[in-house]
């Protein structure tokens, strides 16, 4: 496995050609009005079509243009995972920067790739002198297991803009 920080010239639409985002979701976490959590039986499938792949590529380019970073994992020459960390500080004390993407191709999940990419983002966030990483994470069971095992907790301060985009996501933070 080869891990590296990408350059903007690496971000061509073909980079994501073989990336398989497909995932069957059977359970997802939900919050009750009183703040308690429960695991809800639910079924849906997530996948990216060609239009979404192009949007992701453009989103990653935008991350670069704003001074952010994109990290990738390759199995030989095939992209099998990527993570992006923005470079815009926010929060009441400008303590957060956002982990805007962390995705692993279907065939390579549960092999430690996500952990390595997340740790690369932690190192970069520390280099940038951030105090916390903000994550708008899928509420699906597998994503929550991952982020909680990495030490993420429900955020202390909601980013209203990000929340409005993803109201069913769990808004989390990782304290650096």
Residue ranges and their predicted role:
Residues 85, 154-155:
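Short beta-strand "wing" residues that participate in macromolecule-binding interfaces
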Residues 136-140, 144, 148-150, 157-176:
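C-terminal "cap" of GNAT-fold acetyltransferases
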Residues 125-138:
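Conserved GNAT acetyl-CoA-binding A-motif
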